[in-house]
Amino acid sequence: MDIKQTAVAGSLESSDLMITVSPNDEQTITITLDSSVEKQFGNHIRQLIHQTLVNLKVTAAKVEAVDKGALDCTIQARTIAAVHRAAGVDQYDWKEIDSWNV
């Protein structure tokens, strides 16, 4: 999926994550994370965001995530929503997304 514009999903409420996805001219994926549980779960959160981007076939993006204790399913859902908004895609391939949970 080609990231065309900056988009945001989520909130700064407790148990949520606000994620911002922007185009990256360097043709790489960069993830910046701000989390109160970064020492415990930072690597896992980054890996989950990165894997979700790979599953969505994103090859270049700047991602900024502010975590407030979100569960994995919330992190994945917010990432999916932000990527679709940033790519200008309004149709979700639910069958493909469901296949990730095998």
Curated annotation (Swiss-Prot):
In Swiss-Prot or TrEMBL terms, this protein is called: Citrate lyase acyl carrier protein
Q: Which family does it belong to?
A: Belongs to the CitD family.
A Pfam match: ACP
- List where in the cell it is found: Cytoplasm
Protein's job: Covalent carrier of the coenzyme of citrate lyase.
The subunit field of the Swiss-Prot or TrEMBL record says:
Oligomer with a subunit composition of (alpha,beta,gamma)6.
Record-level GO cellular component terms: cytoplasm
Chief location of this protein within or outside the cell: cytoplasm
Q: Which residues carry this modification: O-(phosphoribosyl dephospho-coenzyme A)serine?
A: 14
The gene behind this protein is citD
What are the protein's UniProt keywords? Answer: Cytoplasm, Phosphoprotein
Q: Which InterPro entries match?
A: CitD, Mal_deCO2ase/Cit_lyase_ACP
